């Protein structure tokens, strides 16, 4: 069929299949703003276009509908090198993070302002209601529109976007646009899907329909015979190598309990076979031709089921230890299943697979018996959290190709270096033969720390020699991604009558699902990032992680802290009620203070024993709680309106800024011939603005404009090793490596500048904009670089920095919530939510606020509406964004504020600490304690629903 239509003002004539999906059609025409985030359901809005004057989801159209249509995409906004009014406002406000659906947002807002000169909040919410944004938290979009409206009348107009910090510094703590924001909002090619070549093969995966089963028969011959099928991968022809999907530093503190394909299916969605074909359509047709028979086994779906004496064993294969094998290993293995499979454990992590225990650890300080004996009151409560999904706007995706004898991996990953190490081992290549290019990442939130499809894609390319694309559908994100661990946490508190704690005991039990990636470290962070908030002389913790047959779990932003913090905060609040003490008052009496030693962290490691006992070197909780109390009007009356009851709640929170003594970051900076700089950073910017942090740190040290610094990051050929984007490590680790590299280069520039000026080094200094200034005059960086590159020069000037540390940098914060609960219907309305955070010196204030809003809204979603639900046989019923319940713009609190409260930390660069992860840690307990304040009930399992409210009120 030949169709005629207008695309961004240009007439088009195309021969198409009448039923061809318009999103795919436009994307293949180069309209990269029209993306697919939700399997064509039109829920996410990443595919928004203007169709005959109306915003429409392109995925919901077929090609035949384009006949005589007028189509506009985000490519019509601005010019190739000039942002439109709305795009510029988005960049200036700092709303662009992962950027994946920001072109769609720009198009929708532009259309709104073309129709309504000054839209109300309700009109804004309505216009953006069809857009899904997992990272930005929505609040800053109101600022975008405010700024765009102001600039319509006055192009030079500004609004108050974010405060500034550190008057003694030039660029740190000041507004500066995110370095990659412009190309993202303009939809310039920067994601994996934008790099895929036309000749690429496609992978489609046949997945298990059973939660627990053995493959008894597998025949792929008919699929292999289908024209266009290039290869089929199964357990019969994949590498016989065991690994963990978790992208962590080696040796990994997780069981190596996965083979690329196995005989045993351990969850609905587990891998059966991968078809590599010349088109998606052929691959899908080939999947139907694969013959599989299963022996269906009883699934294990919960912690309690996993603990049962007669529980089915999820991992019944033999175990091999690299070091530290237990005395019982030979006897345990004598009862193991002999299928030719095994698992490997690098070092003791308390694993007992025959008991469904993936990992466990125990520790304590002080004398627990004495602590509880000294208590005037003792309480013990159990709290539960359910499974939640990261929902990155861009699903998992990988594109692999050969470059001569080298494997090139274009990946949407948080850990390019760990990815290279893992894949090189699996495909039997040396690391220098594997080139990982981390493209822009359309959202990660921990899920892209795990290696979930890259190894299959790489193996397919190595076997066939063909370029290969493997992209998860949204359904695969729910059944084959790694989600948040289910947890059951019991807290026992002993206290004096005045509320001061004498003993704290936490029993943290986690459900890791079918594989043990992060099974030690995520649950360990439950106590590690909650117990130190309330220092006590007598503390005991037990962590036990169980295998089951729910869909996989792994790294999710917060990394165990939200579950531990929910339990300790709720238990303390219940203690306060029993003692008739105000919740905020009991927090004040027990909370951590600046300079205080955090003794319990001397007993909790993350893959290895701690080398020292850290302290809270910087902590702004005193000021945070003062401001929060005033903002929420903590002690003011709470009016009642019929069935609606008002309540207020609070939670204090903490996080780490990297993993001392385990992780490392490196950086190299080159002085270019004209005096500008190129930074080769190993860090992985996944939308957090890390490249901008590195830019500003280099500019601050080198006294040059940030515009003179360009960052190349996350490319294993063109940067030095970095652990990757996890554990809130970017600013402290990658940032400090950049600072050290800049300082190293600064000394070289000063030395050669002094020589050129004929002065002692002690008499010269760097000065903005990019000169060495002495008593006799000054010389520019460009002149120094040129001198070095001459035939009699000293060579190119390069600075390097390597950062490791034994020290912790802890960001702190508090969340304050005000809710209204309808005691007749159970409805919960979150009216106010204030997130106040101490991230040290905010390097990028407007980006920091965006990180807080995004993380906080994800936490609100986890608390109010999000959960993966299963039937009795282990089939996940939640498989798309429409049914999952992640919040959109209409779900945010009416009064939603993020506040930066600075401190000065000795570990981070220029006093900075992490910001992106801590924001998810406090919403659940803040909301739950507010619900109790409103109607007197304790909800000990989150998320919170009207049914749970009414059940607790004994109305159903």
From Swiss-Prot:
Residue numbers binding Mo-molybdopterin: 414, 445, 727
Cofactor note as given: Binds 2 [2Fe-2S] centers. Binds 1 Mo-molybdopterin (Mo-MPT) cofactor per subunit.
Entry's Gene Ontology BP terms: purine nucleobase metabolic process; purine ribonucleoside salvage
Keywords, in A-Z order: 2Fe-2S, Iron, Iron-sulfur, Metal-binding, Molybdenum, Oxidoreductase, Purine metabolism, Purine salvage
Keyword Nucleotide-binding: no
Keyword Metal-binding set for record: yes
Cofactor: [2Fe-2S] cluster; Mo-molybdopterin
EC number(s) stated in the UniProt entry for this protein: 1.-.-.-
EC top class, as a word: oxidoreductase
GO molecular function list: 2 iron, 2 sulfur cluster binding; iron ion binding; oxidoreductase activity
A Pfam family of this chain: Ald_Xan_dh_C
Role noted for this protein: Probably has no xanthine dehydrogenase activity; however deletion results in increased adenine sensitivity, suggesting that this protein contributes to the conversion of adenine to guanine nucleotides during purine salvage.
Family stated for the protein in its record: Belongs to the xanthine dehydrogenase family.
Protein name: Probable hypoxanthine oxidase XdhD
Source organism of this protein record: Escherichia coli O157:H7
Gene responsible for this protein: xdhD
